[in-house]
Design a protein with these regions (language model features):
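Conserved S-adenosyl-L-methionine
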Residues: 2-99, 104-106, 115, 122, ...
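A conserved structural/catalytic subdomain of Rossmann-like adenosyl-cofactor enzymes
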Residues: 88-317
């Protein structure tokens, strides 16, 4: 995610659910790669010192984030608070956001209390998604990669409204369908959404590309971890100069109009699952019934012949 978003030196980076600050440490390491920090001007160093922000709600995780940033020499700004609370509204104007919001409903089942998002819902991921795209700088280049569960792609009601606003505010250009159980609990299906904030708040998404890294893939877990090599084909497709020229069955595209015709669902781009029975490939039911009846008749005839032989043996005795 970090390599594809590619944070640059001096860009302000943010993780609104930072955990132990892993994404921001990765962003820091990517940004300084090949850079001599001692050669920076005072202005460049000041911008660099103000580049890496995070918010974490859990106190223990917040302390670990501070320690992790210190150990990696990251000039971090990490607050212990709720990104969905009004106090976090000050955190805006970022160039890069990398994050994996927590899974589940809002604590206590209440709606978010932020009044700077359009749709206050009980769905934590939908609230985080709104906070994320509204926290990006509206300059046409601020960008994000966020891990979200499948329900964000197809939830109706406010879910549909949030997706429409996302595609209006941002160019939602790519969705990576991840294997099951990679993030969150085993069995939870997740995705990575890649988007760039537009300069306006209307019609920024023209088409959305999907890469299916889920269907017909091996089972991943502790004994068979997902590795960088599994993403090679996706990265080739993502970075291709002409995405339409990529020859990969897992790579597909839907225009904004096609998505609208499907009710603005983003639960798209999955290829045929070879493990699932396709009922269209089954023979005609009437033909199957005739074959079954013929087999039964043959079996009955065979049984009757056995009965006759047994009766004959009884007579001989």
């Amino acid at each position: 995610m970090t390599d594809l978003i590619s944070p640059k030196l001096g860009e302000k980076c943010f993780d609104p659910a930072c955990g132990t600050f892993g994404f921001m440490i990765s962003a820091y390491q990517h940004a300084i790669d090949g850079v001599d920090l001692y050669s920076l001007s005072d202005q460049e160093m000041a911008a660099f010192q103000d580049s890496f922000y995070g918010v974490e709600l859990v106190h223990d995780a917040h302390r670990l984030a501070l320690m992790n940033a210190y150990l990696h020499n990251v000039p971090a700004h990490i607050s212990c608070e709720d990104s969905l609370a009004p106090s976090a509204k000050r955190l805006k104007g970022f160039d890069v956001i990398l994050t994996n919001p927590p899974f589940g409903t809002k604590k206590g089942g209440e709606r978010t209390s932020r009044d700077d998002i359009s749709f206050q819902t009980f769905n934590k991921q939908l609230n985080f998604l709104q906070v994320i795209y509204r926290s990006l700088k509206a300059d046409g280049s601020a960008r994000c990669a966020v891990v979200l569960p499948d329900n964000v792609l197809f939830a109706d009601g406010d879910g549909t409204s949030v997706r429409r606003e996302l595609m209006d505010f941002c160019n939602l250009h790519t969705i990576l369908r991840l294997p099951t159980g990679i993030f969150y609990a085993q069995g939870v299906k997740t995705n990575v959404l890649f988007f760039t904030r537009g300069k306006t708040e209307k019609d920024n998404t023209k088409e959305v590309w999907f890469y299916d890294l889920r269907t017909n893939m091996p089972s991943f877990g502790k004994t068979a971890p997902l590795k960088e090599e599994h993403f090679i084909d996706f990265v080739k497709a993502y970075t291709a100069e002409d995405r339409h020229a990529v020859d990969d069955e897992r790579w597909s595209v839907f225009t904004r109009e096609q998505i609208g015709e499907k009710g603005d669902t983003l639960d798209l781009g999955l290829i045929r699952d070879d493990s699932v029975l396709d009922y269209n490939d089954l023979p005609d039911p009437a033909d199957s019934a005739e074959v079954a009846a013929a087999n039964l008749e043959e079996a009955v005839d065979l049984l009757m012949s056995v009965v006759k032989e047994l009766r004959a043996l009884e007579v001989q005795d």
